[in-house]
C-alpha cells in the first residue's frame, strides 16, 4: 500500500480487532509510552494454523506505524502471548513491544520522503501496524550522501547493503565488541580493507596481540614482528623505563628509580654534548643516550657510597640492565651496536609517513615478553599522540589506531594493568579527536574495560554476547538506545552485529561481508581431532623447539 495513502487514510482510524484488517496489516497499536509501543498482532485462533502475523513479526523486525503526518518506524523488542488459553473459542492475544527508531517525514516538493531519527508525531491508539517493506528499508538504509563504504548486508533483507560512513567512523572513536568466536577479527578486517580500498593513502596502526592480521593485508601492510621491531630504550618515558628496569617492591623501586633518573639525565647530556638545548633536557625528553654510559654513571655513584650496605639498589639495576642486554627477546629495545638518533626513521616506518603503498602497519606483539608488553603498547600509543600533538594542524597526518584485546591495556579495575598504558590510551580517547587521532577498540570482555574510555566510542559494532555483565555494559555505553536490537545480542550468528552510532546511517542489524580465504585473519582455534589423528613428531621435533627456546630465535 502507498505510504501517503496509509498516512492520510488510516492514521486517524482506530482498528478494532473484530474489523477487517487493512491489506498487509499485522496488528494495531494498543499502548503508547515514550519511545515504546505495544501492538496487538492479528493471527486468528492461536490454536489453529492462522498465524501469518505471528510468523512474520520476529524479534528485531522493522515495523512501521502511520501517524497524522509521518510514518513511524521501530524494532520489535519482545513478543508475548497474553491469555494463551483464551476463551471457549480458544483465542488469545499476541502482543509485540516496539522500540521506536525514527520517522519518514512528508517530502518537500520534488523530493523523496526523508527519514530522520527521533519521533515528532506519535502514533495514536488503534493505529495500524505494518511490516516494513523492501522499499522502506531502501529509504531508511540508503547509501548516505557523505562518503560511505559497503561492509555487509541488512539482516531484514540480505539484498540491501549495509553502509559505513567513513568520515564519521574515522574522525571519532569506535569499538567492536563480542564474545570469542563471534567474528570480531574478520569484522575488523572487512572494515579496514573497505577503508583502505577507498583511501589508499590512509594511516592505520594495528596492535596485533595474537599475530593473526599479518596475512589479512598482503601487499599493502608494513608487517612488523618482534624480530623486525625497533623501539630503542631511549624512546621510553621515565615511567616506562622504570617499569622495565626497576624492582616491583615499592621501597626498592623508589630507591632504584632515583638512581636511574640521575644516570639517565647525565647520559642524555653526555650524548647531546655542547648542544645549546642540553640544559633544558628532562628525564622524559626523547633524545638518545647510551646505556653503557648509564651503567658507568651508576657504577661511579655506587663507588662514592660511604657504606657498602647501601650498594644493593645499584647492584640490582646493573644486574637487570646486563640481563636485558643479553636477552635476545629484548633485542628490539636493547640491541643495536651503533647508537644514533633515528627517531624520524622509526616513526616513519610505524606511522607510514610517507605511505609508499603500505597504508597500514601491523605490529605483531604476540612474542614480545609479557613482562614488557604493556610498556611497548604504552610507548606506541604515547608516540602516536605526541606526534599529533606537536604537529601543525594544517599539515597533521590523521591516523587510526586499532587496539585489539583492549581489556588487557585499559582494564576497568584501576589497580590492575600498567597506569602509563591506560593514560596513553585515555588521552587518545579524550583528546585525540582534536589532533586527528582516533582509536578502534576490539575486545571480547567489554565489562572488564574502562567504562570511561569505551563510552567515548561514537560507533559500536556489538556482536554475539552471552555474558549478562557485557550486555549491560553495552546498553549503558552505546551512543543511542536500540533495545529492540540489543535484546538479540545472545542469539546473533557469527559475522552478525548490531551497529549503532554516528558511523552508520541508523541502528541496524547487519551481517558482515564474507572475506576471501586469502584475507582471513589467522585466528582459528587449533584442530585437536585432526592433529591427534597421527603420531608424527618425535625427539627431533622437541630438539628443534628446545634449540629455539634456548637461543631465543625463530
Q: Where in the sequence are the language-model features?
A:
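Hydrophobic residues in beta-strands of the RecA-like P-loop NTPase core, especially within AAA+ ATPase
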Residues: 207, 403, 442-443
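Conserved ATP-driven motor cores of ASCE-family P-loop NTPases powering translocation/secretion/packaging/pilus
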Residues: 247, 426-431, 435-513
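Loop/turn-to-beta-strand initiation segments
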Residues: 201-204, 357-360, 396-400, 435-440
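Conserved beta-strand position immediately N-terminal to the Walker
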Residues: 174, 363, 440
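Glycine-rich phosphate-binding loop of nucleotide-binding enzymes
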Residues: 146-231, 451, 499, 529-532, ...
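Conserved P-loop NTPase motor module
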Residues: 494-554
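Basic- and hydrophobic-enriched, low-structure N-terminal and domain-boundary segments
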Residues: 1-177, 394-397, 413
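P-loop NTPase motor domains
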Residues: 211-222, 233-238, 243-424
